[in-house]
Structures are given as structure tokens and as C-alpha cells.
């Protein structure tokens, strides 16, 4: 199958949607399909050959965060060339509600179109402005996918459609291979955080306040771009490569996700579980779903969103109780396997098969 994939967010900055798209493309290529990806990217971004660089992007506040999106005549030109030269059997647009390459591709393309919805909510003025234009465009989509029940519910309620639920995928083997055996771990318990440091909804300050309540010797590693703090006992390592991320998660004992909102999935929770971390997360609906919180053997501990006191209490329990920590690790490893790309990509291909009809995607 000849597959074209469109990403709205810049590949110059790391992000969950970008990582999802690149991983999906690699899995599809390994299965023998022809795949090309289009999205914003500057000339200096290190990207695989299957990515078509869409050029510069601008930071725009969108869905409670700051996303790097592209606008202007060059976007229309790049999309038209991508569709015309690609001769695709199916076009897979991610976040078609996003006013960047994705929205332009949806407006311009005709033929078999699949869309994946990642966002679960948005107070974006940009989206409100484009909503009247979006509704008729969304009718062109033949197959819809939502990465979480939250994303699916929001799409149905706000813009219509009936997407199927297919979660984000993770190459769990990469993180499992990085896992350091428990018997080889020495020193104090290591706690890890990953997220943009200057984005308040990622919750770093909640974790830092919680640490002041913990009267235990711990090692703390913070990954992510932004302004580091000067805090004794906390190692700010900055933005890291995928390899270094896997290595840090693989040696760590506890991964903390103190996010306060704007999350529809939580892919890094799955990565941490696969790497052998016990996961502690805020009780957002998306995180509760990933942690299988209502089951007899949950894959993560939840704390009240925004409560550094509650987070400190949960961390103290896991620091003191090694057996409880290891039970979470085992449950997390089992849970992570349900998100492996081998099953996720198979479900995505099934959606492709329902829309491909022998016609070719073209630009109007």
C-alpha cells in the first residue's frame, strides 16, 4: 500500500504526536509498505529519509500548550506537491483539526482519507475560528481513529464523526532492552521526570515541592528542554535523545507524571512501564486509563492532580516498600505490552483496508 502521512506539528521539537507518526511510519515500512511523511521541519532537524520537510514553523498556543505550526502559501505548495507526487492509495492525516499542514491537506485532498485524533480538549481560539470551515471538510474522512476514549468523546461531541479507538503505539522492546535488572541496581531510589520544564501543565514544580516533603535519600533526574533550576540533589540533564531517554528510564526506579491537564493519552507512561519503572501519575482520566487504575492489579499509582502532599505520600510509600514497587513494575510491564506497535499497527492497517477502494489520493 502507498501511504501518505501528514503531521501538523514541527519535527524541530520533540512531541508525542511527532514520535507516534515516525514510529508508525517505520513499522509500516518494515512491513513492506511505501510510506512518506509530510510535516513542518527545518533543514537542521535530523530526520529519516521518508520525511518530506515542510519548512519553517511558528510557536502558537494550541490545546493548552505551545505547538509549532506552519502557515502561508508555502504550506499549500508543499501539500500539493506531496499529494501529486506521492500517488498514495491512502492519506493518513493526524490532527485534522489543527490549522497547519493537516488542515490544508484535508481541504485539498480527495480520495481515501483516514484521520487520527490525538487531542482531547481545546479552548483554542484558532479552533473556534476554523470550526465552521472544519465541519464540512471532516465529512471527507472515510476512516477515523482516536488514540484514547477522551479524544474520541471530544471529537464526537464537538465536531461529529465516529472514530474507532486505537491507542498510541510504543516499541516496547527498545525500553525493555534498556531495563537494568533489579539485582544490579545500587544506591538510593532514583525518581525520573520527563517534560518541558517551562510548561506549567507538565507539573515539574509539583514534583519539586513534593520532594521537599520527602525525608528520604533519593536520586532525581529531570529530562526536558527549558530553564533548569538550581536544586540540590536534582540533576537537570536537558533534552535527551531517544537512546538516552531509554537508558535513564531503564536504570530508574520510579517515573513521575505530575501533569495537570491537556493530556489525552500519556505515551511516556507506557515507555516507563516497559523500561521497568514503577509509575506514579496524577489522576487525569487519560493517565488512569493507561494505568488501568480500576483493575485488581493497576499498573500505576495515582495521586490527586496538583497535590504535592498526595504525591509525596505515594512516593514515600514506594521508596520504603520495595515489594510494592516491584509489584507495580511487573504490572506495568504487562500493561505496556498491550500498547506494542505490533498490535497497534495491525489495527491501523485494518482501518486503511476499509477505505482503500482502488482510487488514488489526489489534490483538487
Predicted regions and their residues:
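Carbohydrate-associated surface elements
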Residues: 41, 150, 169
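Membrane-proximal helix-turn-helix segments that form the acceptor-binding/catalytic region
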Residues: 121, 127-144, 150-151, 157-158
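Acidic anion/phosphate-binding donor-loop and adjacent secondary structure
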Residues: 153, 167-187, 231
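Conserved donor-binding/catalytic core segment of Leloir-type glycosyltransferases
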Residues: 182-202, 208-212
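Acidic donor-binding loop of glycosyltransferase active sites
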Residues: 250-264, 277
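Conserved acidic donor-binding segment of nucleotide-sugar-dependent glycosyltransferases
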Residues: 292-308, 317-322
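A short, well-ordered alpha-helix in the C-terminal region of glycosyltransferases
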Residues: 317, 324-338
Amino acid at each position: 500500500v502507498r501511504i501518505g502521512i501528514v503531521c501538523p506539528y514541527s519535527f524541530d521539537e520533540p512531541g508525542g504526536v511527532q514520535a507516534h507518526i515516525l514510529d508508525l511510519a517505520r513499522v509500516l515500512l518494515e512491513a513492506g509498505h511505501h510510506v512518506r511523511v509530510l510535516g513542518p521541519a527545518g533543514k537542521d532537524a535530523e530526520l529519516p529519509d521518508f520525511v518530506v520537510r515542510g519548512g519553517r514553523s511558528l510557536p502558537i498556543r494550541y490545546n493548552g500548550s505551545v505547538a509549532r505550526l506552519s502557515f502561508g502559501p508555502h504550506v499549500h505548495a508543499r501539500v500539493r506537491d506531496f499529494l501529486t507526487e506521492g500517488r498514495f492509495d491512502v492519506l493518513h492525516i493526524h490532527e485534522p483539526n489543527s490549522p497547519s499542514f493537516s488542515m490544508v491537506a484535508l481541504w485539498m485532498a480527495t480520495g481515501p482519507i483516514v484521520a487520527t485524533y490525538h487531542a482531547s480538549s481545546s479552548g483554542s481560539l484558532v479552533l473556534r475560528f476554523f470550526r465552521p470551515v472544519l465541519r464540512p471538510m471532516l465529512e471527507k474522512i472515510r476512516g477515523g481513529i482516536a488514540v484514547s476514549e477522551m479524544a474520541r468523546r471530544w471529537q464526537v461531541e464537538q465536531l461529529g464523526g465516529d472514530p474507532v479507538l486505537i491507542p498510541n503505539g510504543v516499541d516496547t522492546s527498545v525500553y525493555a532492552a534498556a531495563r537494568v535488572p533489579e539485582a544490579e541496581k545500587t544506591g538510593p531510589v532514583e525518581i525520573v521526570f520527563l517534560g518541558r520544564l517551562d510548561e506549567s501543565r507538565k507539573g515539574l514544580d509539583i514534583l519539586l515541592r513534593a520532594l521537599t516533603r520527602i525525608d528520604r535519600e533519593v536520586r532525581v533526574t529531570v529530562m526536558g528542554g527549558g530553564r533548569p533550576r538550581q536544586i540540590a540533589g536534582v540533576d537537570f540533564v536537558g533534552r535527551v535523545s531517544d537512546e538516552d531517554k531509554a537508558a535513564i528510564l531503564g536504570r530508574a526506579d520510579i517515573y513521575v507524571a505530575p501533569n495537570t491537564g491537556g493530556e489525552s493519552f500519556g505515551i511516556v507512561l507506557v515507555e516507563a512501564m516497559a523500561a521497568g519503572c514503577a509509575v506514579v501519575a496524577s489522576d487525569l482520566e487519560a493517565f488512569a486509563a493507561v494505568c488501568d487504575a480500576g483493575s485488581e492489579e493497576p499498573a500505576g499509582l495515582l495521586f490527586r492532580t496538583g497535590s504535592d502532599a498526595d504525591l509525596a505520600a505515594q512516593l514515600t510509600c514506594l521508596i520504603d516498600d520495595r515489594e510494592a514497587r516491584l509489584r507495580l513494575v511487573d504490572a506495568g510491564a504487562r500493561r505496556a505490552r498491550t500498547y506494542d506497535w505490533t498490535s497497534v499497527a495491525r489495527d491501523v492497517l485494518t482501518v486503511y483496508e476499509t477505505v482503500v477502494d482502488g482510487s488514488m489520493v489526489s489534490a483538487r
